[in-house]
């Protein structure tokens, strides 16, 4: 598999797996993070993904893991600013797609960001929804 050369969008499932040793994707997420660090790959995300990640880590892992994400991983991220037009577009995507597929509103926002603002860059996610939306997904 050819990995991204210079930039990638990161989803909650990727961040969660990278910090939770009990997650089945923990080792793969760690390998991908190391690859990005070694190859200067820019990690893009949104505040919505950060919020979802911190919440998931707090409830499914623990407080310290959530803070570790905020203190160590978040500073290394390029956070894409999302205005109301992104959220309005995400509402349309959610209403169109989520009836037949289990798509969260956060994932709808990510889809709009990736396709309209980031020129369809690849994604690091373990969430099958991204692939079903036609996005390029690793791993």
List each model region and its residues.
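Acidic, PIN/NYN-like endoribonuclease modules and their adjacent C-terminal/linker elements
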Residues: 1-7, 112, 117-139
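Short, well-structured N-terminal submotif of metal-dependent ribonuclease cores
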Residues: 1-44, 58-68
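Active-site neighborhoods of divalent-metal-dependent phosphate/nucleic-acid chemistry enzymes
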Residues: 3, 79-121
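Histidine- and aromatic-rich ligand-binding microenvironments
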Residues: 8-11, 45-46, 103-105, 127, ...
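Residues at alpha-helix boundaries and the short loops/turns that link adjacent helices
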Residues: 22-23, 60-64, 76, 80, ...
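Short active-site oxyanion
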Residues: 38-43, 76-78, 118-121
């Amino acid at each position: 598999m050819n990995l991204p050369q210079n930039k990638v969008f990161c989803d909650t499932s990727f961040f969660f797996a990278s910090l939770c040793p009990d997650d089945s994707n923990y080792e793969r997420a760690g390998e991908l993070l190391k690859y990005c660090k070694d190859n200067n790959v820019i990690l893009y995300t949104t505040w919505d993904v950060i919020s979802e990640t911190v919440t998931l880590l707090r409830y499914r892992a623990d407080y310290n893991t959530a803070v570790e994400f905020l203190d160590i991983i978040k500073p290394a991220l390029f956070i894409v600013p999302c205005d109301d037009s992104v959220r309005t577009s995400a509402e349309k995507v959610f209403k169109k797609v989520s009836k037949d597929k289990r798509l969260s509103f956060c994932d709808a926002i990510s889809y709009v960001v990736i396709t309209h603002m980031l020129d369809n860059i690849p994604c690091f996610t373990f969430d099958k929804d991204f692939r079903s939306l036609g996005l390029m997904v690793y791993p």
